[in-house]
């Protein structure tokens, strides 16, 4: 009997990436609206990517069975 392939969640595939060591990378959150209230340094620091914590990355990896 053939094993069934597990599907990867498309939404997770678009938002997160895995490093070579297995850490989960995502873009910084909280940059959609309300930027007028924030300081310029805060806005600047939210550019780029961030590495997710242990508990969050475990959840993301459940939805990416083949580490795409």
Curated annotation (Swiss-Prot):
The keyword Amino-acid biosynthesis is assigned to this record: no
Keyword set includes Ribonucleoprotein: yes
Coiled-coil ranges (or none): none
InterPro entries: Ribosomal_bL35 (IPR001706), Ribosomal_bL35-like (IPR021137), Ribosomal_bL35_CS (IPR018265), Ribosomal_bL35_sf (IPR037229)
Keyword list, A-Z: Ribonucleoprotein, Ribosomal protein
Gene Ontology cellular component list: ribonucleoprotein complex; ribosome
GO BP term, example: translation
Pfam families: Ribosomal_L35p
PROSITE patterns for the chain: RIBOSOMAL_L35
An example Gene Ontology molecular-function term: structural constituent of ribosome
Superkingdom: Bacteria
Family membership noted in the UniProt record: Belongs to the bacterial ribosomal protein bL35 family.
Protein name: Large ribosomal subunit protein bL35
Species per Swiss-Prot/TrEMBL record: Wolbachia sp. subsp. Drosophila simulans (strain wRi)
Top-level taxonomy: Bacteria, Pseudomonadati, Pseudomonadota, Alphaproteobacteria, Rickettsiales
Gene: rpmI
